[in-house]
Amino acid sequence: MAEIMADSELAPKFAPFIGMAGIAAAMIFGSAGAAYGTAKSGIGIAGVGTFRPDLIMKCLIPVVMSGIIAVYALVVAVLIAQDLGPPGSGQHYSLFNGFMHLACGLSVGLTGLAAGYCIGIVGDKGVRSFMLQSRIFVGMVLILIFGEVLGLYGLIVALILNTKSKG
């Protein structure tokens, strides 16, 4: 009887809810960052396209980089979801795993939000400046890469945390 009580204290019934909150945090914040980056840089591309339609293909780089942010969040959400199981399946899901998965989701989600914000602003102003001065392109791409790396840092931390939750 004491064994069952100790097990339920370490693995309460609400522990999977916290893990699912990690999935939601990863997808909500990561997708919001990707959407902001896509929308903001898309506005700049639309402005450039009216004056210089020949530059549109080169100016799509910020939009592609914003989409990658959502892929980072999707990868972490799928990894967290693989550790969850339905009640009664005999799978042990502890409170530690729940909080670890919440930390995974928040780390990739919030860094994805920051990266998307960075990519959106740099993409918008960068493509507008590129229309006027072609030498700005290399600098714009470098700044976009540094913005993308913010999301990659969150992905790396989330992957490390996820492996720690497996014991």
Curated annotation (Swiss-Prot):
Residue ranges that the UniProt entry lists as topological domain Lumenal: 1-13, 81-101, 162-167
Q: Which stretches are transmembrane?
A: 14-34, 60-80, 102-122, 141-161
Q: Where is this site: Essential for proton translocation?
A: E148
Q: What is its main location?
A: membrane
Q: Record's Pfam families?
A: ATP-synt_C
Concerning its family, UniProt says:
Belongs to the V-ATPase proteolipid subunit family.
Q: Which GO terms describe its cellular component?
A: fungal-type vacuole; membrane; vacuolar proton-transporting V-type ATPase, V0 domain
Lipid bilayer topology: Multi-pass membrane protein
Provide the assembly information. Answer: V-ATPase is a heteromultimeric enzyme composed of a peripheral catalytic V1 complex (components A to H) attached to an integral membrane V0 proton pore complex (components: a, c, c', c'', d, e, f and VOA1). The decameric c-ring forms the proton-conducting pore, and is composed of eight proteolipid subunits c, one subunit c' and one subunit c''.
The chain's disulfide connectivity reads: none
Q: Which gene encodes it?
A: vma-11
Q: Which organism is it from?
A: Neurospora crassa (strain ATCC 24698 / 74-OR23-1A / CBS 708.71 / DSM 1257 / FGSC 987)
- Give one GO molecular function term: proton-transporting ATPase activity, rotational mechanism
Q: Any idea what job this protein has?
A: Proton-conducting pore forming subunit of the V0 complex of vacuolar(H+)-ATPase (V-ATPase), a multisubunit enzyme composed of a peripheral complex (V1) that hydrolyzes ATP and a membrane integral complex (V0) that translocates protons. V-ATPase is responsible for acidifying and maintaining the pH of intracellular compartments.
* Subcellular location as annotated: Vacuole membrane
Per the record, ranges on the Cytoplasmic side are 35-59, 123-140
Please verify whether the record's keywords include Signal.
Answer: no
Mind telling me what this protein is named? V-type proton ATPase subunit c'
Query: What keyword terms does UniProt attach to this protein?
Result: Hydrogen ion transport, Ion transport, Membrane, Transmembrane, Transmembrane helix, Transport, Vacuole
Alphabetical list of InterPro entries matching this protein: ATPase_proteolipid_c-like_dom, ATPase_proteolipid_csu, ATPase_proteolipid_su_C_euk, F/V-ATP_Csub_sf
